[in-house]
From Swiss-Prot:
It comes from the Bacteria. It comes from Xanthobacter autotrophicus (strain ATCC BAA-1158 / Py2). InterPro entries: QueA (IPR003699), QueA_dom1 (IPR042118), QueA_dom2 (IPR042119), QueA_sf (IPR036100). Belongs to the QueA family. Keywords: Cytoplasm, Queuosine biosynthesis, S-adenosyl-L-methionine, Transferase. It is found in: Cytoplasm. Pathway: tRNA modification; tRNA-queuosine biosynthesis. Its EC number is 2.4.99.17. Monomer. This is S-adenosylmethionine:tRNA ribosyltransferase-isomerase. One of its GO terms (biological process) is tRNA wobble guanine modification. It catalyses: 7-aminomethyl-7-carbaguanosine(34) in tRNA + S-adenosyl-L-methionine = epoxyqueuosine(34) in tRNA + adenine + L-methionine + 2 H(+). Transfers and isomerizes the ribose moiety from AdoMet to the 7-aminomethyl group of 7-deazaguanine (preQ1-tRNA) to give epoxyqueuosine (oQ-tRNA). SUPFAM superfamilies: QueA-like.
Length: 362
């Protein structure tokens, strides 16, 4: 399918730079293909009205790490050069793949000191060596620390990796430390937030619990590839980025029990959706899953487990808008996005949400 079929124009004023306050006050466009009406303008706090006691919600409990680092290149006989690095994928206990700029000023063997004077890091700085330069322009950083010590140092010296479409319009600040983290954040490892979960508040959780529906967590560490547009002309030419995820045996069993009793599975966000579908066999059985998934969901895909999805409004030509089109149909997706733009919905990570329901849904 041609990628330009998923393109659209979004006026800049529709890009949300801060989340709604309170979070569940964000708008929610309910999309019911074939329904009457097909589109309904509500609030995220209305989500419990669509959930019954037989249903289950699945959320992603990944935690965003402060993966944006600032440092100085140190080279024998060379002048110091300021470096910005965004961690994108952990390779092992001490090595990360990262995008660094100016990349042309870095070569294998260079050392970079992140943090330094004024840093909250007890060590004063975090040191790394450029271990390799990759074909995609990224570098491999081999840190002097490993494991938990490295995690603590990154947390101390790093900044929240706010999305590029926000960073281009304002600087990251202390508010983002809280705003860009979900209520469910528990397992550190993401370099981008599972943004649909940003809408949840304790009050909304209490209302969902009152419906009798069950809540389950999975873990999928979101990579920087989530922001990248598809550059291929056709979807068949796109190579999906891989992300690490886990569906526990207990969660798989609980979700299978929900389906067996005629209940529905609602996923919160594209990350939970992709992970649950990765863990589901052709027979519809959800199995325990641990490892990387590069599932690429486009129109024509048959969903095996997910019955409803809460997600934000996504970038043009992105794999995420393709997933939305796969779930509700391409024409319904285009109508929903056109309506959202005309009605002034806020887009992207800090923006509003849409609740996608299958044809004939509640």
């Amino acid at each position: 399918m041609r990628v330009d079929a998923f393109d659209f124009d979004l006026p800049e004023e529709h890009i949300a730079l801060r989340p709604a306050e309170p979070r569940d006050a964000a708008r929610m466009l309910v999309v019911r293909p074939g329904g009457a009406p097909e589109l309904s303008d509500l609030k995220v706090r209305d989500l419990p009205d669509f959930i019954t006691a037989n249903d289950a919600l699945v959320v992603n409990d990944t935690r965003v790490i402060p993966a944006a680092l600032e440092g100085v290149r140190e080279r024998d006989g060379g002048s110091a050069v300021r470096i910005e690095a965004n961690l994108i994928k952990r390779l092992d206990a001490s090595r990360w793949q990262a995008f660094a700029k100016p990349g042309k000023r870095l070569r294998v063997g260079d050392r970079v000191r992140f943090g330094g004077e004024g840093s909250a890091c007890l060590l004063g700085a975090l040191d790394a060596q450029i271990a390799a330069k990759e074909d995609d322009g990224s570098v491999i950083l081999a840190f002097d620390l490993a494991g938990t010590a490295l995690d603590e140092a990154v947390t101390a010296v790093g900044h929240m990796p706010i999305p590029p479409y926000i960073a281009a319009r304002r600087a990251e600040d202390d508010r983002d430390r809280a705003d860009y983290q979900t209520l469910f954040a528990r397992v550190s490892g993401s370099v981008a937030a599972p943004t649909a979960s940003l809408h949840f508040t304790p009050e909304l959780m209490a209302r969902i619990a009152a419906t009798g529906a069950s809540m389950h967590t999975v873990t999928l560490h979101v990579g920087a590839g989530t922001f990248l547009p598809v550059k291929a002309e056709d979807t068949t030419g796109h190579r999906m980025h891989a992300e690490w995820g886990e569906v526990s045996a207990d969660t798989a069993a609980a979700l299978n029990a929900v389906k067996a009793k005629g209940g529905r599975i609602f996923t919160v966000g594209s990350t939970s959706t992709r992970l649950i579908e990765s863990a589901t066999g052709e027979d519809g059985t959800i199995r325990p899953f641990v490892g990387e998934t590069d599932i690429f969901i486009t129109p024509g895909y048959r969903f095996r487990a997910v019955d409803g999805m809460l997600t934000n409004f996504h970038l043009p030509r992105s794999t995420l808008v393709m997933l939305v089109a796969a779930f509700v149909g391409h024409e319904a997706q285009k109508r929903a996005y056109a309506h959202a733009i005309a009605a002034g919905y806020r887009f992207y990570s800090y923006g509003d949400a849409c609740l996608l329901l299958p044809e004939g849904g509640p």
